[in-house]
Amino acid sequence: MTITFLILLFTVVKGDQICIGYHANNSTEKVDTILERNVTVTHAKDILEKTHNGKLCRLSGIPPLELGDCSIAGWLLGNPECDRLLSVPEWSYIVEKENPANGLCYPGNFNDYEELKHLLTRVTHFEKIKILPRDQWTQHTTTGGSRACAVSGNPSFFRNMVWLTKKGSNYPVAKGSYNNTSGEQMLVIWGIHHPNDDTEQRTLYQNVGTYVSVGTSTLNKRSIPEIATRPKVNGQGGRMEFSWTLLETWDVINFESTGNLIAPEYGFKISKRGSSGIMKTEKTLENCETKCQTPLGAINTTLPFHNIHPLTIGECPKYVKSDRLVLATGLRNVPQIESRGLFGAIAGFIEGGWQGMIDGWYGYHHSNDQGSGYAADKESTQKAIDGITNKVNSVIEKMNTQFEAVGKEFNNLERRLENLNKKMEDGFLDVWTYNAELLVLMENERTLDFHDSNVKNLYDKVRMQLRDNAKEIGNGCFEFYHKCDDECMNSVRNGTYDYPKYEEESKLNRNEIKGVKLSNMGVYQILAIYATVAGSLSLAIMIAGISFWMCSNGSLQCRICI
């Protein structure tokens, strides 16, 4: 008997298809989200400035006041080595070296010096005004000087101060006053000399048991010289102690002394207030402009954050400790696997992007008898671009509050306060850094979810148009039950697909496909049964043949019992 096996081959012919997908490119930009790290995206925006120009620049067109080798005290008192600072124009900020050489040439101290520096962070210009002319002290010698402040080997003194000493053998009570009619607050500085011993006291002032008294409407200060033997500094065993006050408009300051007074010749009218600061750096001014200055260099940026230096002056981004703050603006960048082809590459429409679609974020790929191609969905892409652009700009605008962070000065008696201040500032900085990083993580999560939602919406838009005229094939694609030429494809893309036009054709093709599926099931069942029976029969014949052969050669004894 001859058995003929009939092998049926079914060739599956794919119908016209349209897929929804999104753009992909060669970008290696990575962002972090709340749930993921190092997510590759097609587009991103860095909002953390990391660079500076390494220069000191004019701030908004106004140069800084460079003190050079002089300190704040040397400038205001008039150290002879600081003569170039006797008259200074408006400044944007003050540049002081870390350890300037020319401060108090005559050794001593400056009371409330750190508070004075803090005052200077709110001032951008002083007008120097003569308040107690040197020639008014007719009963005293006003040419006092010291070799500690020598110029060209000759004794000298602070240019803005007058050291009153005895005239002949007399030092009558010295009195002077100034009425502030300038219309602005006036910075007034004075001093008291503490001699090394009684001999020096009598040599300079004749009197012993002297005092220096200063009074305003809010100040009443009386100081007594402290005569003591001290180590010599700059060749001097004596010390000078300087104090200052802000004299209000129409207020009067009165000086009275029986000896040891360092009287002011000039006061400093606060002629212009503004945001300033003291920049501690060894750099010098260069020919450049900026809106934000740090000790390391100028920052020119519109970004809301920077990590260059915590101390800044001008319109500056907020300093954070972060190394990276990147906002996602594009989509997840997962290019399709080219070797697998378009329709085999995408397991889901948010699992693989199309590098071939370059004119939009979201769009379509179609395949029909006329060919295949990509087409971006311009409307959804533009809405997404506008939405994300507005969001990024809003984030930058909200966080781009301009800050100035100038260093605070503390004297040796305030170290505990300084340490507490540093801890507080570090705490605030940690909070700002955390807020910035959390903001970026949350916005990136929302942006990527936004893109996924837009692709899903586009998919649903197509699905609702096609209804049962096409089937979903589970990869972001639809296979039509009817022929769909380029005009038909375009109608699907622009939302004008005519469902009734293709309904009858789709219905017929859909029924035929169902019939083929049923007949296929019958054939498969018959083949399965036949294969089982044939296999069993073959096994039985094989066993019988082996048994017969073994019986014939004596290897197997066969007994037939009746």
UniProtKB/Swiss-Prot annotation:
<keyword id="KW-1160">Virus entry into host cell</keyword>
<feature type="disulfide bond">
    <location>
        <begin position="105"/>
        <end position="149"/>
    </location>
</feature>
<feature type="disulfide bond" description="Interchain (between HA1 and HA2 chains)">
    <location>
        <begin position="19"/>
        <end position="477"/>
    </location>
</feature>
<feature type="glycosylation site" description="N-linked (GlcNAc...) asparagine; by host">
    <location>
        <position position="494"/>
    </location>
</feature>
<keyword id="KW-0564">Palmitate</keyword>
<feature type="lipid moiety-binding region" description="S-palmitoyl cysteine; by host">
    <location>
        <position position="561"/>
    </location>
</feature>
<feature type="glycosylation site" description="N-linked (GlcNAc...) asparagine; by host">
    <location>
        <position position="300"/>
    </location>
</feature>
<keyword id="KW-1165">Clathrin-mediated endocytosis of virus by host</keyword>
<feature type="topological domain" description="Extracellular">
    <location>
        <begin position="16"/>
        <end position="525"/>
    </location>
</feature>
<keyword id="KW-1170">Fusion of virus membrane with host endosomal membrane</keyword>
<feature type="disulfide bond">
    <location>
        <begin position="292"/>
        <end position="316"/>
    </location>
</feature>
<dbReference type="InterPro" id="IPR000149">
    <property type="entry name" value="Hemagglutn_influenz_A"/>
</dbReference>
<keyword id="KW-0449">Lipoprotein</keyword>
<keyword id="KW-1015">Disulfide bond</keyword>
<feature type="disulfide bond">
    <location>
        <begin position="484"/>
        <end position="488"/>
    </location>
</feature>
<feature type="glycosylation site" description="N-linked (GlcNAc...) asparagine; by host">
    <location>
        <position position="38"/>
    </location>
</feature>
<feature type="disulfide bond">
    <location>
        <begin position="70"/>
        <end position="82"/>
    </location>
</feature>
<dbReference type="GO" id="GO:0055036">
    <property type="term" value="C:virion membrane"/>
</dbReference>
<feature type="disulfide bond">
    <location>
        <begin position="57"/>
        <end position="288"/>
    </location>
</feature>
<keyword id="KW-1164">Virus endocytosis by host</keyword>
<keyword id="KW-0732">Signal</keyword>
<comment type="subunit">
    <text>Homotrimer of disulfide-linked HA1-HA2.</text>
</comment>
<keyword id="KW-1167">Clathrin- and caveolin-independent endocytosis of virus by host</keyword>
<dbReference type="GO" id="GO:0020002">
    <property type="term" value="C:host cell plasma membrane"/>
</dbReference>
<feature type="transmembrane region" description="Helical">
    <location>
        <begin position="526"/>
        <end position="546"/>
    </location>
</feature>
<keyword id="KW-0325">Glycoprotein</keyword>
<feature type="glycosylation site" description="N-linked (GlcNAc...) asparagine; by host">
    <location>
        <position position="25"/>
    </location>
</feature>
<keyword id="KW-0261">Viral envelope protein</keyword>
<keyword id="KW-0812">Transmembrane</keyword>
<dbReference type="InterPro" id="IPR013828">
    <property type="entry name" value="Hemagglutn_HA1_a/b_dom_sf"/>
</dbReference>
<feature type="glycosylation site" description="N-linked (GlcNAc...) asparagine; by host">
    <location>
        <position position="179"/>
    </location>
</feature>
<keyword id="KW-0348">Hemagglutinin</keyword>
<feature type="lipid moiety-binding region" description="S-palmitoyl cysteine; by host">
    <location>
        <position position="551"/>
    </location>
</feature>
<feature type="topological domain" description="Cytoplasmic">
    <location>
        <begin position="547"/>
        <end position="562"/>
    </location>
</feature>
<dbReference type="GO" id="GO:0019064">
    <property type="term" value="P:fusion of virus membrane with host plasma membrane"/>
</dbReference>
<keyword id="KW-0472">Membrane</keyword>
<dbReference type="GO" id="GO:0075512">
    <property type="term" value="P:clathrin-dependent endocytosis of virus by host cell"/>
</dbReference>
<dbReference type="GO" id="GO:0046789">
    <property type="term" value="F:host cell surface receptor binding"/>
</dbReference>
<keyword id="KW-1133">Transmembrane helix</keyword>
<dbReference type="GO" id="GO:0039654">
    <property type="term" value="P:fusion of virus membrane with host endosome membrane"/>
</dbReference>
<dbReference type="GO" id="GO:0019062">
    <property type="term" value="P:virion attachment to host cell"/>
</dbReference>
<feature type="site" description="Cleavage; by host">
    <location>
        <begin position="340"/>
        <end position="341"/>
    </location>
</feature>
